[in-house]
Amino acid sequence: ANRAQEIARLNGIYDGLMRNAGVLRLQGHGRLIDGQTVEVTDAAGRATRHRARHILIATGATPHVPDIEGRELVVSSDDMFDLPAFPQRLVVVGGGYIGCEMASIFRGLGAQVTLLYRGEQILRGFDDEVRQFAADEMRKHGVDVRVRCDVARITPGAGDTRHVVLADGGTLEADVVLYATGRRAHVDGLGLREAGVAQAADGSIVVDERFATSLPGVYALGDVVGRLELTPVALAEAMALVDH
């Protein structure tokens, strides 16, 4: 309840900032028609078209869970703060910063946490010394960090528990299995292909050094372009685009 209240408070602040800046907010689903037109469909199904000289796409990304047996038994990072009960035993699959954050948070709250990562070391893409230090500190604080460890499948356990079957034949039992195995650009239904906006193989929007897409007049930034998916990075990109 406190989390929901805080989110509502922050949303109210952002709404006020936009109103004071003269921003008109349209509630609905947006679809790109061309380089200067967006169609917005509201909850009642009414569609209106709006034109602008420049269009910015900043729809973010959503958690990606690989297509493994038992994927319906796992949760994503978006679900972790809406769990019906605190997990006494948590298995985190994925060694990126989101997985490491979640593992550390729930260990700090008292959960027994195991983090599984199929690579050689957690936090791929970060400085090697930082990666080793983070792994050592997590282990020091009680997180069971296992590298070169892959999951074969997830099966139901007794009650609401889950069995994590590892590729080497080992098993783990958990109350919650969190998959933090990356995020994918949130582009479904935006009409990018029809409008002529180029996308990478993973669905993210292709942009140049000035955040321009392949469609003149349309820009994109933040997680939807598939670069460093961090809030400070998105804010810096937005400021750079505004200055440009």
Protein language model annotation of sequence segments:
Residues 1-2:
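Glycine-rich active-site loop/strand segments that organize a redox cofactor
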Residues 10-11, 48, 85-87, 98, ...:
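Structural/interface elements that position substrates and couple domains in central-metabolism enzymes
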Residues 17-56:
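Conserved redox-cofactor binding core of oxidoreductases
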Residues 24-27, 31-40, 109-209:
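A Rossmann-like FAD-binding core segment of flavoenzymes
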Residues 57-115, 141, 193-195, 199-214:
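Glycine-rich dinucleotide-binding loop and its adjacent helix/turn
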Residues 72-87, 171-244:
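FAD-site-proximal beta/loop scaffold in flavoenzymes
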Residues 93-96, 126, 223:
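Glycine-rich Rossmann-fold phosphate-binding loop(s) that bind the pyrophosphate
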